[in-house]
């Protein structure tokens, strides 16, 4: 009985151990995650691409900028859309913005294209014999001299190249350079044009007025322009108020120095921007919040236009000048300018604390840098800005004017201007332009929206900082407008872990993987969590192809508007390049989806298991707390690896499907008798026979080794050895009866086929016996496991019933106890309340009884 009890206890321990092990396996199992591909998620990366321009230029206009714009730009979108990206922070850097470089190249193209049909004045690079020209001012009836205008004669080639004749023309003193003669005491009467030794001079065409029009820069399909809307953004660093646009605002390509004209204004207060305020070599861009009007005038004059033939099909325009053509000036309100300087000083003092701010004139250089140069009505003005930058501001904010001239103390600051006809071009070294004189009065009114300043270096311990007007690098002009934009590339593919797995034809070889990229027509879901953004994939995915189609329509409209010209300029090539790039990116993404087996799907599951080394965040952290941009940064280093694993997994899946389809050829019974199949049968039969023969040889060798170890050496496998009989059993035939000895020899066979048959028979019997034994063992094990499992289930069922009954009884007892306790408590409470009420009711009686006793 004791042994039986011990055995029964061991049985229970084994059952309990099995159940605990199973429960531990279930609880310790981690749910497997799989890579899922998403198409159309809001993710972008910084990129450089070819932008195209849009403008509202009229095709019939002859102004140079508008002619260029109609050839180069598409019409603007009448309903531009701007989508604010909630919960998005993006880094901007205005000093490393490729949009600035593109605009710089485009404006150079604008000027070059405007001047391309104009005449080069290389034949005028000859010796000029000049004398001073007196000009009559017909309004005041006075003679103006001083050598401002030179009347120069020179020899020039006519339409016939071997013929030379003498001509004369009027040049301004600033446009010619004297040539010294051998005799130093002689008067300088020999001159040359100022840029002949360094530049190729081009004469501006008569129709060129250089009047800038707003130009919008647009991103091609598959790209987007991010815009920073922070009102105090300094040009670098993170921006929290971000939106996405397809095109920038209209930017006027105004070429000027020192002062920025007709640009955009800061929304709240003045903003100063510099790549490094401590480096005095870096330009400081001042962005004003209120414009200061500047009115420039060149008084009326009469120009009798004449032209000189300088070769076949080329003419040089000059003329007789009546009136002082060089007398020009610009007016600025003193109060507005001083108020603007005061606000600029406050902002500069934030960077240079407790220092006196000094504004001074330019330190020298080319005339374009020393003066405020700009174009007004086709004439190039060079205005002296000394009066604008001639003040000192101490720490208390009080200004001290550097010049006490009474004329300056008026309400208006008047800047004297000079006009040049030979201009040093800003596009690069070695280019110059001759602007023919323009008759009549010239007026232009502009708005100063910014300043370009440079800071003097030197002793850092000095108590004052000197700022001077700068400029000359037109990239700073464009940078002052493009500071809040950046171009990004939309990545339409994204990958993330999910619990869903693709159902495929099973096979063991599998890969691992996950990650992605994404596309976005509108990036409105960029700040949403991954779970929320995945619900808008259809809208965003459609934007990619529709954006390509829209861009193609814009290009075709532009070509149709110019079909009478059909000039495929560099801008036409840019348009085509942008469209081809968008199509290529779209096809590349579709190709990847096809390779991964996800064609036409926005959400595509895979058989690639998610590796925790890529990201060990939980599903809730990923889908409910992270945006797609944050997730992209998390797994960016593993994107290529996951793409490769998805591709390998899909290749394996296709191989599995191919092998499955190959089994269909056995569906037809007639295919079993194909000669190809018969050859395959013969090959399999030969392999089986060879294997059996090899097994027979192995078993024979093992048998010999076994018998040798027992001390028995057979003479031959085919020798028939008689069986010895005991002394009590005489020799006889088999038919005589009696049990023969077990040690008798095996049957002797003759011939190769008989030997093979005997071996096959023995091998089959051996295999049969072993398989039968194995089957019996497996059956016994399964029966034992089934019985034990059934007993375990019954035990668990009884245990469950027992505990259910116990829990039920406990619950009933608990409810009864609670009911009894509540009832008793309720009775006590009622009794106490009754006593209190009776006591209160009996108070008057007790009082009366007390009074009665007192009276007695």
Swiss-Prot record:
Superkingdom of this protein's organism: Viruses
Extracellular-side segments: 32-684
Paired cysteines (S-S): 53-73, 118-205, 125-196, 130-152, 218-247, 228-239, 296-330, 376-444, 383-417, 598-604
InterPro entries given in the database record: Gp120_core_sf (IPR036377), Gp160 (IPR037527), GP41-like (IPR000328), HIV1_Gp120 (IPR000777)
Chain intervals for the UniProt region annotation (V4): 383-417
Region (Disordered): 716-742
GO biological process: clathrin-dependent endocytosis of virus by host cell; fusion of virus membrane with host endosome membrane; fusion of virus membrane with host plasma membrane; positive regulation of plasma membrane raft polarization; positive regulation of receptor clustering; viral protein processing; virion attachment to host cell
UniProt-annotated stretches for the region V1: 130-151
Residues bearing attached sugar chains per UniProt: 87, 134, 140, 151, 155, 183, 197, 234, 241, 262, 276, 289, 295, 331, 338, 354, 360, 390, 394, 404, 447, 459, 611, 616, 625, 637
UniProt region (CD4-binding loop), positions on chain: 362-372
Locus of motif Di-leucine internalization motif: 855-856
Segments on the Cytoplasmic face: 706-856
PTM comment, free text: Highly glycosylated by host. The high number of glycan on the protein is reffered to as 'glycan shield' because it contributes to hide protein sequence from adaptive immune system.
Region (Immunosuppression): 574-592
Lipidation (S-palmitoyl cysteine): 764, 837
Record note on domains: Some of the most genetically diverse regions of the viral genome are present in Env. They are called variable regions 1 through 5 (V1 through V5). Coreceptor usage of gp120 is determined mainly by the primary structure of the third variable region (V3) in the outer domain of gp120. The sequence of V3 determines which coreceptor, CCR5 and/or CXCR4 (corresponding to R5/macrophage, X4/T cell and R5X4/T cell and macrophage tropism), is used to trigger the fusion potential of the Env complex, and hence which cells the virus can infect. Binding to CCR5 involves a region adjacent in addition to V3. The membrane proximal external region (MPER) present in gp41 is a tryptophan-rich region recognized by the antibodies 2F5, Z13, and 4E10. MPER seems to play a role in fusion.
Protein's name according to its UniProt entry: Envelope glycoprotein gp160
Organism: Human immunodeficiency virus type 1 group M subtype B (isolate WMJ1)
